[in-house]
């Protein structure tokens, strides 16, 4: 097939005024500017996570979309996993009662097999940090289920990535949910050889639930008063990149939603405001403590 290719997004947009939707799947630090260019060229946009690396840039995308009457779809495909959809129903139905404590643990491997292949990964300006690149999916799930957080306290460390990244590889965060309850989020990419887990534990008024597996794809524990756990559909496997694995391979559902939403048949699963909120939460998490940032000097 004779498919045209470009090294400049604006050149592509200028050459193809017939485009309806543009997918922004470039390095994180380019997402906002390229989404803005697409919107201003008359396109709807699908933005891979994160929407941007700062709240200010995300707000610019949101305002441009409103001004031009365009839709923004943020790729947060873990929402489509059966355990995530089940948790959403359990929380929104009130079956769990008051949420008292939430603990999220994300322990993955990202070593030279990952950072050594693609130069922008691990850089401050184009990657942004582990919360943006590896774990924003799970911050999105947390926000989607329980709402916003405040009173954030954090600690960050770089255990074994000083040679290949500009920032932390691990962190511990505690906070309160605005809607009530306490939370904690611990993460690391310093796990040896392979991913260990991504888990979410809920201590609630009417019971306890834990979702685990490598990317919150398994129900590990369910003990809820007067409730019998149903059999959920199987989760899709993780995105497999050879030497390492990512989150759930649910991108097909994202694009089904894009088509359905633009056809007026569905609501957007993860809209611009939700994508912006994830960036805002990460920005506040990082602001809660000193990060082990490598000094970057301009040449």
Question: How should these model regions be labeled?
Answer:
Residues 3-64:
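Beta-loop-alpha module in the N-terminal Rossmann-like domain of NAD(P)-dependent dehydrogenases
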Residues 78-164, 292:
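Predominantly a Rossmann-like dinucleotide-binding segment in NAD(P)-dependent oxidoreductases
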Residues 133, 139-217, 252-265, 298:
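Contiguous beta-strand/loop segments that form the cofactor/metal-binding neighborhood of enzyme cores
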């Amino acid at each position: 097939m004779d498919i045209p290719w470009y090294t400049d997004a604006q050149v592509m947009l200028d050459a193809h005024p017939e485009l309806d939707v543009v997918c922004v799947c470039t390095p994180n630090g380019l997402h906002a500017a390229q989404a803005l260019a697409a919107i201003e060229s008359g396109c709807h946009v699908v933005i891979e996570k994160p929407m941007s690396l700062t709240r200010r840039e995300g707000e610019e995308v949101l305002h441009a979309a409103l001004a031009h009457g365009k839709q923004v779809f943020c790729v947060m495909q873990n929402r489509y996993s059966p355990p995530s959809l089940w948790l959403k129903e359990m929380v929104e139905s009130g079956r769990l009662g008051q949420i008292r404590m939430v603990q999220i643990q994300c322990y993955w491997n990202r070593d030279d097999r990952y950072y050594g292949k693609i130069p922008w990964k691990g850089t401050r300006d184009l990657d942004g940090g582990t919360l943006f690149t590896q774990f924003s999916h799970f911050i999105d799930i947390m926000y989607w289920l329980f709402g916003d957080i405040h009173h954030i306290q954090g600690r960050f460390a770089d255990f074994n990535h000083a040679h290949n990244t500009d920032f932390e590889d691990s962190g511990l965060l505690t906070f309160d949910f605005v809607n009530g309850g306490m939370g904690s989020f611990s993460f690391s990419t310093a796990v040896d050889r392979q991913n260990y887990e991504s888990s979410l534990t809920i201590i609630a008024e009417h019971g306890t639930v834990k979702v685990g597996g490598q990317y919150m794809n398994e129900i590990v524990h369910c003990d809820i008063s007067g409730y019998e756990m149903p059999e959920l559909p199987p989760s899709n496997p993780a995105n497999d990149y050879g030497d390492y694995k990512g989150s759930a391979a649910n991108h097909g559902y994202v694009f089904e939603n894009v088509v359905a939403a633009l056809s007026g048949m569905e609501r957007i699963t993860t809209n611009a405001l939700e994508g912006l909120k994830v960036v805002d939460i990460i920005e506040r998490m990082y602001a809660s403590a000193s990060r082990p940032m490598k000094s970057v000097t301009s040449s």
